[in-house]
Amino acid sequence: MRTTTSLSEFIAESTSHKAEYAHHPVQLLNEIARAGNKLSKQINIAGLTDILGDLGNVNVQGEIVKKLDLFANDTFIQSLSSNSHCAAIVSEENEEIIVLNDTPDKEGKFLFCMDPLDGSSNIDVNISVGTIFSVYRRTDSTKKVTKEEFFVQGNEQVMAGYIIYSSSTMLVFTTGNGVNGFTLDPSTETFYLSHPDIKTPTDGEIFSINEGNDNLVPEGVRQYTQFCHETSNGKRTHTARFMGSLVADFHRNMLKGGIYIYPTTTAAPNGRLRLLYECAPLAWIIEQAGGKASDGFGRILDIRTQDLHQRVPLFIGSSQMVEKAEQYMLDH
């Protein structure tokens, strides 16, 4: 018999008063969970339906759009549009903001940022993928939304999370009071609390980086990966694990202890990952779990977004590992 808490029960317990709920970002969670459930179903039968492969067009990132990218994007937009408190969305798949509810009668208090399907290039080979999202509170919900409202620092987030679609589907999020993980029961289409108050180890053995870029990355990164390859008494001190799926690599490292690095390269001098809807939300999650997130020299959450699709380098994971990597960057 089930004894754990459902997502709906968790939301109710988090906002015991109606007035508190009206201003709390968790009121978007039901729509997020609904979209995640729908996308999870589609991913699970992707090989049996005509939804694998490319659409043939290119998104604002210069990336080939997958059929599932578009499905995921549309699914989350449609779900969130039903919540009058979501004023506008920034998505990896759209060049400009998507305005939903920004009139005074709609009370659109929140701004939603998302990568609707991170790692979608892995879908065709059945590797874990995910959705990353972030929520900010508007300073004035009586005005029309402009893209400048999204030019914020990550430390202004009021909710951040991700959904990982793998052997099971999990929703992991924070509102600033720790990190909690919920696993989807597909038989009831309900998320249940399975990983309460997640804490990441202060140190770890896993390092996740695309070492195929070794000749393209800064010297500090090369020196750090060489350090990770060192042995002690004939045994390795670290182990390399890189799936090429940000959510999957991050999720494993947060639970087991490790570091994920996507640095600048000569081909991507500003980094590859997007600040607003990839790096900032994961940075807040890892900090809430006791870890650290950096661009190699400073805190990710202190960076102010200057462009909707701004890219930054990312060093994220167990605090001691991130600090060690930062030291190598400073020394080289």
What are these regions (language model features)?
Residues 1-50, 57-59, 70-332:
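IMPase-like, lithium-sensitive Mg2+-dependent phosphomonoesterase catalytic core
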Residues 63-66:
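Alpha-helical scaffold segments that form or flank carboxylate-/histidine-based iron centers
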